[in-house]
Amino acid sequence: MADFFQNGEISNLHRLKPGDAKRLEKELEGFSQKRPIALVLPALFQDLTAKPIKNILSEIAKVNYLNEIVVTLGRTKKEEFAEVKAMFASFNLPVAIIWNDGENIRELYSILEKEGVSAGGDGKGRSAWIAYGYILARGKSDVIVLHDCDIVTYNRELLARLCYPVANPNLDYEFCKGYYARVTNRLHGRVTRLFVTPLIRALKRIIGRIDFLEYLDSFRYILAGEFSMRADLARINRIPGDWGLEVGVLAEIYRNCSLRRICQVDIADNYEHKHQPLSEVDPNTGLNKMSIDIAKTIFRTMAGMGVIFPSGWVKTLKATYLRTAQDFIAKYGHDSEIDGLAFDRHQESVSVETFVKGIELACDEFERDPFGAPQISNWNRVTSAIPNFFDRLKSAVENDNT
């Protein structure tokens, strides 16, 4: 049974009545008449040939409140794109497929580069960003919802609960982030459990109360990739192009929204998707790289807000983080014991030791370059630099889909 505790700086919308999808869907059908909903599905070709996608599409096909679906494909060859088009050809909802590796879209990326509003390199951030642009160019949806295509435990209730807070005009939220537990026979979500939350708590102890850190600490699953937002936010939000995507998006939401317009919603009893390796010896891949990118995003965002990091802060942060994370390991060990879950204390400790090294690398990079790679520009800047870009984007996607 879910709790009903309200903690932190944002509203928590709990799942107190599971199995209520039909009521939610009926209400969403009404809300969508005034606030049409677009669903964005960022995917690699391998996601669309893996086992979970069949169930995901089967569940999506049963809903009647979506106005449009945008599948934004990364790392996809020509013959693979043709296969994906065939997959969606008979789908019962309007589907546009953005082929990010195709000639038409690559030409647009080149134009952006020449005009000084680069969309950065290939990745989920750029794929999501171009999908938002296409939705804005069409101008037919007021709500944008995004989730991944590798969710093993997907069902219609997850989608409905994700859409509902922003689609419902009576609630008046502009941004909603999903949260959930990630449990099989053991606890998952190592980067959230053992890195991000302990890092935020360590920073709070060192630097003191910072509103931005209090805000981040309010999210129950800060790295969840599922969210909904008003389409207007897609015009003004910038997007990171690396593993700092989720935290970077939250930073932009913090910058552009009132806290009263931000919420998080419990979307599932449990959530399972593909797992990333820790990669403890290689900081350029896996959870190791993810932790470094996330830390840099947090440090750079704080610096941009005027936070001054004290002298000697790196050593203090590493020590404080390590102690905090070790305390978290003990808590999760107790959690696992009472619930009869497997718990490998050694592997949990290896993860934390890897993340400590990642913090040092992130701090070094931050001090060397406090700005980092520029974020992907917001769409207002793009259309200011290239007034007819939306028309070009619509034409490119439509040409690829014919």
Residue ranges and their predicted role:
Residues 152-181:
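Conserved donor-nucleotide/metal-binding helix-loop-beta segment in metal-dependent transferases, i.e.
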